Amino acid sequence: LGTTRATMPYNDTVNFSSNILGCTSRFPILRKEVICRYQMNGAVVFYLLLNDNDTLRLINCHLQSMGLTAEDREQYHDIVVNPEEKRGGVEKHSRLLVSKISRASVIRAAQADSVAAYIGRNAGKSIIVCGDFNDTPISYTHHRIHSAGLTDAYAATATGLGRSFNRDAIIVRIDHMFCSSHWKP
């Protein structure tokens, strides 16, 4: 912790109920601005002074969670691994899972629209967007941020599926990083 403070002495946070979005940096944090907020989730932009005339807009996101409980994930795992054994409950549990995922997707779409609108208002500026999007690379959320003119750092530099969530037979990449043309991934 002491080494981190010595190399990155600047820190700021925004509290979203029980979640905190923050930025720890070696560059001064000029200010912060909440882009969107919904219950415990949202997006915050931190303005970092890189040098005398260059400001980075660092957008940290923790977008709406699916809201799946440990029991939901266990039922999903059972459906995937043993669909024949769960035949009677598959339809009921599938409907419940789809309902939760649908509700969360609607909220995330609005959050993604807010982040994309911010990016659009700041076109031509130095921007990095990162965080827990709780959505996959084929989602509306990912597409909306990417189509705002940013580069998907993983797609530009990595190979393979990529995964940032791996639990109960759910293996996906839901954490993402995007950058403006000022940055090379």
Predicted regions and their residues:
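Active-site-proximal beta-strand elements of phosphoester/diester hydrolases
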Residues: 55-64, 91-97, 101
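Soluble or luminal CAZymes and related metallo-dependent hydrolases
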Residues: 38-40, 103-114
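Short hydrophobic/aromatic-rich motifs at helix boundaries and adjacent loops
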Residues: 16-17, 84-89, 113-114
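Structured beta-strand-rich core segments of catalytic domains in phosphoester-bond hydrolases
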Residues: 2-78, 177, 184
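Second-shell loop/turn segments in exported
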Residues: 98-105, 128-131
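N-terminal short leaders/motifs
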Residues: 1-3, 134-135
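Metal-dependent phosphoester-hydrolase catalytic domains
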Residues: 47, 109, 114-128, 133-185
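A solvent-exposed, charged loop/short amphipathic helix patch at secondary-structure junctions
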Residues: 73-100
